[in-house]
Regions:
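Acidic, metal/ion-coordinating pockets
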Residues: 17-311
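Short linear sequence elements within intrinsically disordered, low-complexity coil regions
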Residues: 8-11, 66-67
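C-terminal motif of bacterial Sec signal peptides marking the signal peptidase cleavage site
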Residues: 13-15
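Sec-dependent signal peptide recognition
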Residues: 2-8
Length: 311
């Protein structure tokens, strides 16, 4: 009797067993990864160290950080112009042409050129730098322009169906006298910047703004930076990447006019430089993921620009 009952239960269970469930695959949301660092600033001691028998090789400066800066898009502020002619350090910087290729080898593909040292080698230096970076089609060079038409042409990149627009703004350069003669070469004017912001917002999913601003060696953003950040946010900026001060400054979210938030890094400090001050050796890396209309997984990573003096 017990055997029959057990058999009946077994038959009942086997007869009522549910069909195997089909595995439901969760649809992945398309996204791209983004990493940003601060000033790539080659002083004379660094030029001397990178000199080889056949030219220059700067890749060694990045060997300890390279694996951490790999992303779909990797931003760096190229502080010194690739002006052609003899390379030089402070005060009139001039980086060799090989810098562009070395940055690409390391992993950088978004490069800001609008800095206070952009005019160190004059208008010819700006044009030469543009020409050099244009030889690398996988790289996007921001902030310097050959003519007015190019200045108003928004740089947009696309990956995984996500369009990212870049707008670049520079507060000033060393040697301001050229502005009236060649105003299109660098974007100083708020009116032009707002016009570019409007175009960027209309034609892209995400807008990232590079701002070379503030006061050197300050630890906190000043009134100009705060006001400009708010203006850019209200114009639709999703992320603002600040450079120039050579020091770390605040990273925060600010409210936009449309109710969304803008991620602002007022200054990421130096990335690579020959500066001796401790405050100029502390720096940061900002990383995040980009979805169609969203910035997520934001991480700030502190870095140290470490080097040893050999001479």
């Amino acid at each position: 009797m017990k055997y029959q009952l057990l058999l009946a239960v077994m038959l009942l269970l086997s007869g009522c067993s549910a069909p195997p469930k089909e595995e439901v695959k969760k649809k992945e949301t398309p996204s791209v990864s983004f990493v940003a660092v601060g000033d790539n600033l080659y002083h004379q001691c660094m030029l001397d160290e990178a000199k080889t028998s056949s030219g220059y090789d700067f890749t060694g400066y990045y060997k300890n950080i390279k694996k951490y800066i790999q992303a779909d898009y990797c931003f760096v502020n190229q502080e010194t112009i690739l002006g052609g002619g003899t390379p030089s350090g402070y005060p009139l910087f001039n980086a060799p042409d090989s810098v562009a290729g070395d940055l690409e080898k390391v992993g950088f593909n978004i490069v800001n050129g609008a800095t206070n040292h952009a005019y160190d080698q004059g208008a010819a230096g700006i044009l030469h730098s543009i020409q050099v970076f244009n030889k690398y089609p996988r790289m996007t060079y921001l902030g310097l322009y050959k003519n007015e038409e190019e200045k108003l042409n928004i740089k947009i990149v696309e990956k995984n169906g996500i369009k990212i627009a870049f707008v670049s703004f520079n507060q000033y350069v060393n040697g301001m006298t050229y502005q009236k003669k060649l105003p299109y070469m660098i974007n100083f004017h708020e009116s032009t910047m707002m016009e570019n912001m409007k175009k960027a917002r209309e034609n892209a999913d995400i807008v990232i703004v590079s701002c070379h601003w503030g006061i050197e060696y300050d630890y906190y953003p000043n009134t100009f930076q705060k006001n400009m950040a708010k203006q850019l946010a209200d114009a639709g900026a999703d992320v603002i990447i600040g450079t120039h001060t050579h020091t770390l400054q605040d990273v925060e979210y600010i409210q936009r006019a449309d109710g969304k938030r803008t991620l602002v890094a007022y200054s990421l400090g130096n990335f690579v430089s020959g500066m001796l001050e401790e405050s100029c050796q502390l720096e940061g890396m900002l990383s995040f993921d980009i979805e169609k209309k969203k910035i997520k997984n934001v991480v700030f990573t502190p870095l140290v620009n470490y080097y040893t003096l050999t001479g």
